[in-house]
Amino acid sequence: MTEQIKVSEVSSILRQQLEGIHTSIKLEEVGTVLQVSDGVARIYGLDNAEANELLQFDNGMEAIVMNLEEDNVGAVLLGPTDQIKEGDTVKRTGRIASIDVSEGMIGRVIDPLGNPIDGKGEILGETCEMPLERKAPGVIFRQPVNEPLQTGIKAVDAMIPIGRGQRELIIGDRQTGKTSIAIDTIINQRSNYEAGNPVYCIYVAIGQKGSTVAALVNTLQEKGAMDYTIVVSATASDPAAMQYFHPFAGAAIGEYFRDSGRHALVVYDDLSKQAVAYREVSLILRRPSGREAYPGDIFYLHSRLLERAAKIINQPEVAREMNDLPESMRDKVKGGGSLTALPIIETQAGDVSAYIPTNVISITDGQIFLETDLFNQGTRPAINVGISVSRVGGNAQIKAMKKVAGTLKIDQAQYRELEAFSKFSSDMDPITALTIDKGRKNGQLLIQPQYSPMPVEQQIAILYCGTHGLLHDVPLDKVQDFERSFIESLQLNHQEDVLDILKTGVIDDNVIKAIEETAAMVAKQYL
């Protein structure tokens, strides 16, 4: 006779069995690709997707949500379009598009997603997740620009000074030396790095040829600048979406250094290509177009990017309350850091009144305008002093430079005007002739070879000679010879009593006397 199981025993057995089962439910919102073309996918089923959220396809490729429509979302692909097809499944990640930043990135070449592309292996070190899109620091978390960022270029440091935390536009036609100014500025930070107070540089190459970027990285390595530089590259062959998000990756890396109390410089080369990439993506997403077929928010694209450059208040307790601060950075925040931006814009036939140039001019704190005519005449850097300006950099200029070069910008502008009139007149009064002679010689002093930044103390000494008429007896074609001999003489005889004092920003009577005596001695050979 079989043993019968009582009802009460059945319930206790079932209870024991159920207690041994552990289940975890994980919900994933999954959508389906309706259509894919030209780097953009339309996806159905992701009703709760957020703007700028990262999506993931079955094959591991990622996309970023840009359009939120009634029954589908438009996402830009961060990879080749041919790897995605209609009907593929895609899931939400719940993460806003971001880049993992670490100290190991210094000296490396990476793509906009933070992946190394220089063949030197994985990037090591503790990482911080920095969002690509982030609100700029509010006014309460900033302090005025009051610390100089020396470019090593005489014409810039004397007449259009740049301060840490400033946004200074470099604008001009193609092949006028825009990138050269930015690269010289990066190379000039070598002295800060050696002094133990580095300015970390991020060079963002947007839509350039891979060979051009490789040559540039090679130059930075030869000059020892890769020790404190990160190169972020999205080449012309990369999808438009990568070129569009590319500058935001550079800004996020710069913010990592800025928020941790250090100084950073980011070069966007160039934002014209980003604007074209954004126009392409927007038109494919069927957003309404405006002037020159750019979308209506093209101004906001550049303003929200460039406003992230700032000098942060030197109070850590206030800086920690900064808006939109990533959680991964909260315990690393220190005050007093800065992020300086040098955006580059390419003009067509010198037209600064076009849509994108006028937008970026109105966003930035000044512009360095380069002219093709000056470049072809041999004036390099080919800076048009008349319409180049630095609105806040004057407060950051060191006192000795301000004292020596205070009138240089006006003098050179007047010289350009008088020189134009002198072509129509056969006879000139002595004062006009003297002004033109001085202007020409100062123009020769401001010419500088590429990749040869000059320390600020040497700049002050040689510019004193130009602004105070000490080149009167030097022939025009010998001005650059005079400059070399003068600097060599100062280094040999007056390193401590002149150059070391000028480095501190002080210029006194003893320094002036030594400069004038050295200039007179060197000028004798030209009499």
Residue ranges and their predicted role:
Residues T2-Q17, T23-K26, T32-L149:
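Acidic-enriched and Gly/Ser
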Residues I13-S24, T151-V156, G250, L305, ...:
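Phosphate-interacting basic helix/loop segments used at nucleotide- and nucleic-acid interfaces
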Residues M242-Y278, R330-D331:
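Phosphate-binding/switch loop-helix module in NTP-utilizing enzymes
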Residues D88-V90, A97, V101-G104, I117-R167, ...:
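P-loop NTPase nucleotide-binding/switch module
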Residues Y256, K273, E280-L527:
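Conserved catalytic/coupling modules of large nucleotide/cofactor-utilizing molecular machines
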Residues V199, K209-I253, I284-P295, H302-E307, ...:
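Nucleotide-state-sensitive switch-loop elements of NTP-binding domains
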Residues P198-Y200, D227-I230, G261-L265, G336-A341:
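Loop/turn-to-beta-strand initiation segments
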Residues R164-A215, D270:
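Walker A/P-loop NTP-binding active-site region of P-loop NTPases
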